[in-house]
Every structure is written in structure tokens, then in C-alpha cells.
Amino acid sequence: MNIKSILTNLVLILCISIASSAQELLPTSTTGQIVKHTYYTLSYCEKDEQSEWVYYELTSEMVKGRQPRTDDYRPDEKVSNVSEQLEDYRHSGYDRGHLCPAGDMKLNLTSMSESFYLSNMSPQVKEFNDGIWNTLEERVRRWALTCGRIYVVTGGVLTSNKGKIGPDRVSIPKYFYKVIYDPRGKGKMIAFLIPNEKSEKPLQDYVVTVDSLESLTGIDFFPELPDSIENHLESSKDVSSWSFHK
């Protein structure tokens, strides 16, 4: 076997190892319908016609990617009994808000295109989507650049909604959340819970404990972490180890 073949095999083994590690950190599903795409995994809630969570690994390489937006919004054929359609958002007054943002999926054409499945969308107030939610997305990308690799879980809180839109009755969450885990060293975790409305407040005002978010959603976000690590990280809302200013 030549050196090129050996290096190729080593890279393949490393990629498989990373993918396996990411899958091991999946949140629990309250719906039983877990859908795996190449660069993210989701748990779909049929009664709300959207995902209760989207989970993915975000690396500095992904953030540095140059793939342009594809804007190819479409139903996710991997979802059983899928009925959510573009028509549901038309003239609704709500944005098709990304859960896993397109800005995180610039690695290649596949990652970018997959981010436009409607299963990765949720109805968001425009000022929220363009405002504080976008600010949080940009901040998460900065953390990925600093940390090299982080894990993100995000979604709307489906236990509380503002009504429905469209013929398929897509729920409008009152709140959206993100949980970010940095596995380096002893690990650190931070969680946000933000109302689906315009806000001028700083992101720090919306930091909550992961424990409180789990109680609200019924989801265990990182069940495969050792209990000693999980219990310590999920009970804290200390922001001192997370940069908000650069």
C-alpha cells in the first residue's frame, strides 16, 4: 500500500470516528421520528409540522466555507407523512426561519442545500429572524472558530405556541432555543431561550440553564455525556467562559 492510500484511509477513519462521536451525542426524541441528513440530524414532530430539535456539529472549517446560498426551499422527503409545504408560509406574515442556519452550512453544496429542507424551518417573526436570532447565529459561528468544534441543538419550544399558519397548520413557537456544547477540556455549555419577537436586549439576557430548558421542552439534550459532566454543565448559567464581545 502506498503512502497516498495510507493517508486516504487514515482520513476516512478519522471522518467516520468524528461522525460516530457526533451521533453519540444526539438528544432524546419525544416524537420517535429521527431523520439523519449528511450534516445534521433532526427530530420531527408531525402534529406541529416542524422539528422539535435540529442537532449538528459545527467546525471552524464549516464556518470558513465559501458555498453560496442555494435557496432551494423544499419538503423533506425523509420525513414520514410529510405535509409541510411552501404554501404554508406564503402570505402568513412569518419568515421561514432556519433552525440550522445556512450560514453554518457553507462547507459544500450538499450541506448548503440540505439546510433548505422545510423540516429545518419554523415560523419566525421577521424582526426576530433578522434581529436577535441572527445575532445569536453569528455569535455561535464565532465560538466555532474559537473552539474549533462545537455541538449545537436548536429549535422552537413546541409545548407553547402562538397559533398556526397555512393549510397544514404549522405551529408558531412562542420561544426558540439554542444549546451549545464545547467538548474541549472539562467541557462547557451554554443555552438560550428567546421569545419569537423583536428584541433590542443583549444575548446575555436570554441565557438560561440547560436543566430549565429540558424541563420546558421535555428533551434531554446530551444524554450520553457522563452524569458527572452533564449534571455540572447543565445546572450552570455562567457566561464568563463565553465571549460576547469579539
Predicted segments — roles?
Residues 1-10:
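Bacterial N-terminal signal peptides that target proteins for export
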Residues 14-246:
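Domain-level detector for secreted/extracellular nuclease and nuclease-toxin modules, and
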